[in-house]
Amino acid sequence: MILVPITEVDWDPQRTAAALAGAVADVEAVVGPFDLVLFGNESADAGGFQVGVRVAYALGRPVVNGIKGIDVADGVASARRQIDGGFEVYNVPLPAVLGVKEGINLPRYPTMKGRLASKKAEVVVDERSAGAGGQERVRLHRPVETVSETVILGTGPEAAPAIVDLLEELGVLS
């Protein structure tokens, strides 16, 4: 396990991705490339959907986000993304980066023996600098709320003339 402590500056998605891509590259230089690098689909704080995509780009790997299922065989990851009425399936060559959605797995809780063993596990602290980045919020404002009214123009075929009149008034029909 590698721990990258967050101490010095705000870690925006650009800085976070740079640090993680650097850590992955450093470990891969020793142990060889990982078949899959998995990320959550989005962060809980900013919800930017950026970190996994940025890491994939930095590592030069294909990326698929929004994944609800994964199968790996013969150097290819089949990643399933849920859509209305079914799934989209993406076959990507390994190594790859995937952004997974909540519910992709059922958590396995450690046994007491596993918990005790984890206390002895080595944790490598990577004192990586935040580096370049610095996405800056320029401004944040709430848009003016608009109130819209729903007008029922009738029901069934009797409503057709009223709808045509409204569309002509709006300039949709001429």
What are these regions (language model features)?
Residues 1-174:
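N-terminal glycine-rich FAD/FM-binding segment characteristic of electron-transfer flavoproteins
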